[in-house]
């Protein structure tokens, strides 16, 4: 994604709309400056191992600090996607999502990977904003537990293997994540880092609250049943045979998760059960909002 927080107007004028301003925060000028530096130094040899240095901490902080600063100046309703750096955490305040006008999100892959994985996985984990340092990964989890970060997402982007198996500059950014996102969080639960209540709150309750989604995000009578049922005692090894994406690959290929997904329900319909996808898909519906 390209950051569009380049003008005060987009946030200033948001008060004339009932919608929340949502931003992917990377400063494009900083990224382009870094791209030029690495191109001059490495030429055709620039690789995914340089990605977090090109789309670096400063590019994220400059953009997110601008967005948050403008939101405070104009009392705007702002939600920042895909936080990736420890430095950005000071921009956000702890508290209940219902009491905030400035909220934030973290993605599951930024809670799992760090810069050491680039040497093995390369373009498979090339994504924007980039996966950064271990200190950033642990800071994101800490901020989540402190309620500075309100929502957990996947930023699922299932590019084909042929697209990703290209040179660094030609390979698209993004990775498939929705199949294993919950298992990443269950691994953190198994490590006593996060509790189940927090997982449910950040992946479901707070999403519905923040965006005022009608009749979703909770297990309640009259609500749509969008539910994942897990076996937290049944390990699961990712392989090409059990990857369900049409793109056919996952950066977690070969990884052993501590839990398994037994069943998923979409709008009250069983979409997946015990390794089998339902024949009569899709069950999707257009969501509605209470605004």
Task: Identify the residue ranges that each predicted region occupies.
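Short, solvent-exposed beta-strand-terminating loops
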Residues: 23-37
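Short, flexible, mixed-charge acidic loops at enzyme active sites
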Residues: 33-44, 115-121
